[in-house]
């Protein structure tokens, strides 16, 4: 029977059907090839928005820089980045007046964080620009490389393990006349194989020392590497995102800590909370505006969109904000916080891989690296690319483009939210001094504005005033893309509000299904997703039950583990049938071993092993969960694991799921092909790093949930811990005198070796 899809909506209120229009089913679009073009677009656009600013030259790097601050006031609706310092400072002052002590208290909280944060905070995060190798690396490796280079150049404050001390080294490094670095490289040689007599390519790994002069080092320290943002739905064009290096990251982290602390105290801020907490916060603001607009007042809401938020923001403005917020604080604290915006005012954007050329005869392909764009003949390029390159050329230095104005995506989300909220704060009647007033919500570049006034003219006047105030702070509300509605219907950060928030279920669609981690994790994540959607997203019992059945079906097809009594033939069915036949209690078999599904919507919170434990045959229990079974992966048995879920918008979020270690929780091995590439040295470093950390955690079993705070090195800490434990074990009779002496001797030897080093 054919179903007419419109029939599905007969009983559904229109606002609940909104989610069906979202582009969230199927695979998201990924970018291929180089991001060089997108990055040049960003750089050129940013300069265009600030073109009436003042040009200066950076004395250290020689980079040309454009400063639009306090530039001409806009005369049209075109986006522009001419923020006015005095207006920003005034907005900050009013924000403080409405929230007495907010900056003071947040500074005190941040100061505590600054003094306690360990360097390993910087190992969080994914790809990071590694300035020593001039390309992206996992954060932990990039940090390890940076510290290694610092130490070989005599910068050792970082050895205390505190982030603030690492940052002292960063500051120190910028004053050095030169920095020595070690780079990995590979040589390729064609040689004849003795056995097969064929020619083969032999690769040898090498490390070479290189010296960077002050200028080259500064350029690298100020570089943001760029990539194309992947998996963006609902857009035809891709765009570039930036990943900063380790020199910038620590400073940004402290600024964002302060800004986060402020955002937590602002009722209009959609950050840093998320999910239901965010919805509750938003609903409060709406309720306030609705109850205060009595019968005499009209209330309208703008679903707002800003034009190129990041490209019109300016680090110099952020510096002014920070200077104001920290004005009564100790000098060292103000200095630490002001470095991030100063570095961003002098930032360089790396243009990525460059362009790939193919000859017409298709026999030749060649890569033009970004470094060559400054000098190459432009006749090889098409018109649009030629225009881009011509425009960007004056800004190029060593393959990077000088980009003083603008912020890159996602760098100062919290701080830019504070800026946005400061405008919303100005909507109170005591500031507008007229009959209209406004309030709203801000979350990074997304906003919703609620305007109340006695009549339509008042509403219009309020919106105009808001629009102009934004312009003064370098924020450009898009008149084309924002729309206004009677209060009660609007959208904010993909939450749809219609007298309460409507579940936008389509956004969760990508996280349904089998994740592909391993049989154990996938089962757990699958049922957790369904459970979470019943709690948060109006997933009803009938639909949840159906989702569960579809998930189990999907799971069985993915892992070829159909029930033992099924007729379906797969590669595993022979083994599974054998197990099925010799099992007394068939209900106890896990789904991944061909067992039946015992999940229903009431028991989704119980891990499958626990759900079936009482039903299992004893020998099956013994095989499944025996720590001595070499196939049971016991890293650390933590009761909770984290899966990275990709929601339809916003950053990947961590989702917790119950983890029970069994023979099914295997970890796939690293692909071997990496071992032949120049990444190999990096990989060895990473394994070394891993081994040290594992060893450390053996000495301090609690370190997996609490970082040691102190200034001794890892080795010293382990030696002293070993001494204490040995003495306790000896005194309680757990070890013999000989063992005690031997361990103490080893400890002394280690200390002696450290001293000699």
From Swiss-Prot:
Ranges for the region named Disordered are 53-82
Q: Name one GO cellular component term.
A: host cell cytoplasm
Q: What is its EC number?
A: 2.7.7.48
Locate the region Promoter-binding site.
249-256
GO molecular function, one example?
nucleotide binding
Query: What's the short name of a Pfam family annotated to this entry?
Result: Flu_PB1
Q: Which UniProt keywords apply?
A: Eukaryotic host gene expression shutoff by virus, Eukaryotic host transcription shutoff by virus, Host cytoplasm, Host gene expression shutoff by virus, Host nucleus, Host-virus interaction, Inhibition of host RNA polymerase II by virus, Nucleotide-binding, Nucleotidyltransferase, Phosphoprotein, RNA-directed RNA polymerase, Transferase, Viral RNA replication, Viral transcription
Record localization: Host nucleus; Host cytoplasm
Domain RdRp catalytic residue range list:
286-483
Q: Catalyses which reaction?
A: RNA(n) + a ribonucleoside 5'-triphosphate = RNA(n+1) + diphosphate
| Renumbered ranges of motif Nuclear localization signal | 187-195, 203-216
According to its UniProt record, which protein family does this protein belong to?
A: Belongs to the influenza viruses polymerase PB1 family.
- What task does this protein carry out? RNA-dependent RNA polymerase which is responsible for replication and transcription of virus RNA segments. The transcription of viral mRNAs occurs by a unique mechanism called cap-snatching. 5' methylated caps of cellular mRNAs are cleaved after 10-13 nucleotides by PA. In turn, these short capped RNAs are used as primers by PB1 for transcription of viral mRNAs. During virus replication, PB1 initiates RNA synthesis and copy vRNA into complementary RNA (cRNA) which in turn serves as a template for the production of more vRNAs.
Q: How does it assemble?
A: Influenza RNA polymerase is composed of three subunits: PB1, PB2 and PA. Interacts (via N-terminus) with PA (via C-terminus). Interacts (via C-terminus) with PB2 (via N-terminus); this interaction is essential for transcription initiation. Interacts (via C-terminus) with human PKP2 (via N-terminus); the interaction competitively inhibits the interaction between the RNA polymerase subunits PB1 and PB2.
What is the name listed in the Swiss-Prot or TrEMBL entry for this protein? RNA-directed RNA polymerase catalytic subunit
- Native species: Influenza A virus (strain A/Russia:St.Petersburg/8/2006 H1N1)
């Amino acid at each position: 029977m054919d179903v007419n899809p419109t029939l599905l909506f007969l009983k559904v209120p229109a606002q609940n059907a909104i989610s069906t229009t979202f582009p969230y089913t199927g695979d998201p679009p990924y970018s291929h090839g180089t991001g060089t073009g997108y990055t040049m677009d960003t750089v050129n656009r940013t300069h265009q928005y600030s073109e009436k600013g003042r040009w200066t030259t950076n004395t250290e790097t020689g980079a040309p820089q454009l400063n639009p601050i306090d530039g001409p006031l806009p005369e049209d609706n075109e986006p522009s980045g001419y923020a006015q310092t005095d207006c920003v400072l005034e907005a900050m002052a009013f924000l403080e007046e409405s929230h007495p002590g907010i900056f003071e208290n947040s500074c005190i909280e941040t100061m505590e964080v600054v003094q306690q944060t360990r360097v390993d905070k910087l190992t969080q995060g994914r790809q990071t620009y590694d300035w020593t190798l001039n390309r992206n690396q996992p954060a932990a490796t990039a940090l390890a490389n940076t510290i290694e280079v610092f130490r070989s150049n005599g910068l050792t404050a970082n050895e205390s393990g505190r982030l603030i001390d690492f940052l002292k080294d960063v500051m120190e490094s910028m004053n050095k006349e030169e920095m020595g670095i070690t780079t990995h490289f590979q040589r390729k040689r064609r040689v004849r194989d003795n056995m097969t007599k064929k020619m083969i390519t032999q690769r040898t790994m090498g490390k070479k020392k290189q010296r960077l002069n002050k200028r080259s080092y500064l350029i690298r320290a100020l570089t943001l590497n760029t990539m194309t943002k992947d998996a963006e739905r609902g857009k035809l064009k891709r765009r570039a995102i930036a990943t900063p290096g380790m020199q910038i990251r620590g400073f940004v982290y402290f600024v964002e800590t302060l800004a986060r602390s402020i955002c937590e105290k602002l009722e209009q801020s959609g950050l840093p909370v998320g999910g239901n907490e965010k919805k509750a916060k938003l609903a409060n603001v709406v309720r306030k505006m609705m109850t205060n607009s009595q019968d005499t007042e009209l209330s309208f809401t703008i679903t707002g969109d800003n034009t190129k938020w990041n490209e019109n923001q300016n680090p110099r403005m952020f510096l002014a904000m920070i200077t104001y917020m920290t004005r009564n604080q100790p000098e060292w604290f103000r200095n630490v916080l002001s470095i991030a915006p100063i570095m961003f005012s002098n930032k360089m954007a790396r243009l990525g891989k460059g362009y790939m050329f193919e000859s017409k005869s298709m026999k030749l392909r060649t890569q033009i690296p970004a470094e060559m764009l400054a000098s190459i003949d432009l006749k090889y390029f098409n018109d649009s690319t030629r225009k881009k390159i011509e425009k960007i050329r004056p800004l190029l230095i060593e393959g990077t483009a000088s980009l003083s104005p603008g912020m890159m995506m996602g760098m100062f989300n919290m701080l830019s939210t504070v800026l946005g909220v400061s405008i919303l704060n100005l909507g109170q009647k005591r500031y507008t001094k007229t009959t209209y007033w406004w309030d709203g919500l801000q979350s990074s570049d997304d906003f919703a504005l609620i305007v109340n006034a006695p009549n339509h003219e008042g509403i219009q006047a309020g919106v105009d005033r808001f629009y102009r105030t934004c312009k003064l702070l370098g924020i450009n509300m898009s008149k084309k893309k924002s729309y206004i509605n009677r209060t009660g219907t609007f959208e904010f950060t993909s939450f749809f509000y219609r007298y309460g928030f409507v579940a936008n279920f389509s956004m969760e669609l990508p996280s349904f299904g089998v994740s592909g981690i391993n049989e154990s994790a996938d089962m757990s994540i699958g049922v957790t997703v369904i459970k979470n959607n019943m709690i948060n997203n109006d997933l009803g019992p009938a639909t949840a039950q159906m989702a569960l059945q579809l998930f189990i079906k999907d799971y069985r097809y993915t892992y070829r583990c159909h029930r033992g009594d099924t007729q379906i033939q797969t590669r595993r069915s022979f083994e599974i049938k054998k197990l099925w036949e010799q099992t007394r209690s068939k209900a106890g078999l896990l789904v991944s071993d061909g067992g039946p599904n015992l999940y229903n919507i009431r028991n989704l919170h119980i891990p499958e092993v626990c759900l079936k434990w009482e039903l299992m045959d004893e020998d099956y229990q013994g095989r499944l969960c025996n720590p001595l079974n070499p196939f049971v992966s016991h890293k650390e048995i933590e009761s909770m694991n984290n899966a990275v879920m990709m929601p339809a918008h916003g950053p990947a979020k961590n989702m917790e799921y119950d983890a029970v270690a069994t023979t099914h929780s295997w970890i796939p091995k690293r692909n071997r092909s990496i071992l032949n590439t120049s990444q190999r040295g990096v990989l060895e470093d990473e394994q070394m790093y891993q081994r040290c950390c594992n060893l450390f955690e053996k000495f301090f079993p609690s370190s997996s949930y609490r970082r040691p705070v102190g200034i001794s090195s890892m080795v010293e800490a382990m030696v002293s811990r070993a001494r204490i434990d040995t003495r306790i074990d000896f005194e309680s009779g757990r070890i013999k005198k000989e063992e005690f002496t031997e361990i103490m001797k080893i400890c002394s030897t280690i200390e002696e070796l450290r001293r000699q080093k």
